[in-house]
A protein has these predicted regions:
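Active-site neighborhoods and metal-handling regions in enzymes and metal-associated proteins
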Residues: 2-114
Length: 114
């Protein structure tokens, strides 16, 4: 065993990798679920509630909610917001550029996608 492997790298078992994969799949499915709701008239806060409900229905918890004081399940940026915007009641408008970051914690492992 090399010095680096002994002190810095923890190899994952096939079971751990399967759990990590499911955590990521929960995020993927969540993003697919809310994508169709990013339309004029809806708000980021509506998407956030829907995402939290779905993640919890998958026996996972929202990965960002409460992490470093984060108050939401999703981080949503609109237009001029660079990254990690908090969901608000700002109504989506035609032509908005929307970025969504989502995470889940499933059986001790995080899935994350931006």
């Amino acid at each position: 065993m090399t010095f680096l492997n002994r002190f810095m790298i923890k190899y994952k078992t096939s079971e751990e990798i399967a759990i990590m994969r499911e955590a990521a799949q929960i995020v993927s499915r969540t993003l697919g679920l809310i994508a169709k709701d990013i339309i004029p008239g809806n708000t980021p806060r509506q998407l956030d509630r829907k995402a939290e409900e779905y993640i919890r229905s998958q026996d996972a918890v929202p990965g960002f909610l409460g992490l470093y004081g984060c108050p939401s399940t999703l981080l949503i940026s609109i237009n001029e917001q660079v990254v990690h915007g908090l969901p608000t009641d700002r109504v989506f408008q035609e032509g908005d550029v929307v970025s969504v970051d989502c995470g889940s914690l499933y059986k001790g492992y995080y899935g994350d996608h931006a």
